Regions:
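His/Asp/Glu-enriched, well-ordered alpha-helical/loop segment
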Residues: 80-87, 128-184
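A general structural motif
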Residues: 67-72, 91-97, 118-123, 145-151, ...
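Divalent metal-coordination and catalytic microenvironments
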Residues: 25, 55, 90, 104, ...
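Active-site-proximal loop/turn and secondary-structure-junction residues that shape catalytic pockets
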Residues: 29-31, 58-60, 94-96, 115-119, ...
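A conserved active-site cap/scaffold subdomain adjacent to cofactor or substrate pockets
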Residues: 96-99, 105-127, 131-135, 139-141
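Metal-coordinating catalytic core of metallo-dependent amide/deamination hydrolases
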Residues: 1-93
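Glycine-enriched alpha-helix->loop->beta-strand junction motifs that scaffold or abut catalytic
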Residues: 44-51, 83-86, 103-112, 132-137, ...
Length: 184
């Protein structure tokens, strides 16, 4: 709520000139943060040139909640709120409907593939389609709730296995996985 927003703004103000600490805005996900707060945080991030990190379209439960409350998918909901842009790091984006990934492309948000978490859920990110849409994407480890080892080499291996098991064409190459896991 308001107290957490005030704390986040205070944290940013205390560190905004730091050469080593770079605050970001990080609302959890579209089903746990109200539309009002999501918009407020997005506006604050844009006004202060901060990145925003959000877990987006991660689970079927999130999809069902957003569908029942907003009659759309989590990605379309975020897009309709105006919170997707080139400063957004969107973890997951693996429980999607037709048109969702195209909205990520249009908004220039940066999706993060969390292979271990997606593998456990049985719902890997469609990295080939993202690449066809010219959407840049990266590889991450997720949080302790979805992954308990934070091993980037294991995530890279899992990314190869998952992608190549669901790809309809053009398997992802190890060189590409290394780039996605290591570039800024």
């Amino acid at each position: 709520g308001n107290e957490q927003i005030s704390l986040a703004k205070s944290f940013n103000n205390n560190w905004e000139n730091s050469k080593t600490v770079h605050p970001i805005v990080a609302p959890h996900e579209t089903s746990t943060v109200s539309p009002k707060v999501l918009k407020e945080l997005s506006n604050y991030a844009l006004e202060n040139n901060l990145l925003t990190h959000i877990h987006l379209a991660q689970t079927q439960k999130e999809m069902e909640y957003i569908k029942s409350n907003f009659e759309t998918s989590p990605i379309k909901h975020a897009y309709n709120l105006g919170i997707l842009n080139e400063k957004v790091i969107a973890a997951h984006c693996n429980v999607v409907e037709d048109g969702d990934l195209e909205l990520l492309a249009e908004s220039k948000a940066f999706p993060i593939f969390c292979p271990t978490t997606h593998g456990i859920a049985g719902k890997p990110m469609n990295t080939n389609f993202l690449s066809e849409l010219n959407v840049d994407w990266g590889i991450g480890t997720d949080c302790s709730g979805g992954n308990d080892d934070y091993d980037m080499l294991e995530e890279m291996r899992t990314a190869l296995v998952l992608n190549n098991s669901v790809a309809k064409k053009d398997f992802i190459k190890p060189k590409e996985v290394f780039r996605k896991a290591s570039e800024e």
